[in-house]
């Protein structure tokens, strides 16, 4: 019997460690329109914020990464900093799977809201969070958070604050 060439590769999800920080940096650089951060920032995301981040791998290759943190004044809210999915893993629902994996961790069972920022033209991110809101059976709303002129001195597109929730705890 011939191997099935249409079979999708197995993608494993795990809580990241500092060892993937450099891979995260490379992955994000290949995922426009994401803003690159310093490698140091990616190391901190992978270590200090590992409970609210996830790494997706095919074998040893990092193909997806979500970074986030609990908003200090509202610890029931996960702020999603970045969602990166490499070309090899696109079209498989990996971004939603990664977000749900973070929410399903025992340490995150009290999170019942998500916030993120999205530029108006980032159709993939809008579709991701609109779809996630549907899957979580909750509402989604948005408003300007950082204005192109007022906050970014015309150096960056306006960032819309997107709010998803409230929702019930996500089970693994």
Swiss-Prot record:
InterPro entries, A to Z: Acyl_CoA_acyltransferase, Ectoine_EctA, GNAT_dom
The protein's Enzyme Commission number: 2.3.1.178
Keywords: Acyltransferase, Transferase
Regulation of catalytic or functional activity: Inhibited by zinc and cadmium.
EC main group: transferase
GO biological process: ectoine biosynthetic process
Keyword field contains Transferase: yes
Coiled coil region boundaries: none
Temperature dependence: Optimum temperature is 20 degrees Celsius.
Protein's pathway: Amine and polyamine biosynthesis; ectoine biosynthesis; L-ectoine from L-aspartate 4-semialdehyde: step 2/3
Entry GO MF terms: diaminobutyrate acetyltransferase activity
Gene3D superfamilies the record matches: 3.40.630.30
Keyword Oxidoreductase attributed: no
Function: Catalyzes the acetylation of L-2,4-diaminobutyrate (DABA) to gamma-N-acetyl-alpha,gamma-diaminobutyric acid (ADABA) with acetyl coenzyme A.
Family: Belongs to the acetyltransferase family. EctA subfamily.
Subunit record text: Homodimer.
Protein name, UniProt field: L-2,4-diaminobutyric acid acetyltransferase
Taxonomic lineage from the root: Bacteria, Pseudomonadati, Pseudomonadota, Gammaproteobacteria, Methylococcales
């Amino acid at each position: 019997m011939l191997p099935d060439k249409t079979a999708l590769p197995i993608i494993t999800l795990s809580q990241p460690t500092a060892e993937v920080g450099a891979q995260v940096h490379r992955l994000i650089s290949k995922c426009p329109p994401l803003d690159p951060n310093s490698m140091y920032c990616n190391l901190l995301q992978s270590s200090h914020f590992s409970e609210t981040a996830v790494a997706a791998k095919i074998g040893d290759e990092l193909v997806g990464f979500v970074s986030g943190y609990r908003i200090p004044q509202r610890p029931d809210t996960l702020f999603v900093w970045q969602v990166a999915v490499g070309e090899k893993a696109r079209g498989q629902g990996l971004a939603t799977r990664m977000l749900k994996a973070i929410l399903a961790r025992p340490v995150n069972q009290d999170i019942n809201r998500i916030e993120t920022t999205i530029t108006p033209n980032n159709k993939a991110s809008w579709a991701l969070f609109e779809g996630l809101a549907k899957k979580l059976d909750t509402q989604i709303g948005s408003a300007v958070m950082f204005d192109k002129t007022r906050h970014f001195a015309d150096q960056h597109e306006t960032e819309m604050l997107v709010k998803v929730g409230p929702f019930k705890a996500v089970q693994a």
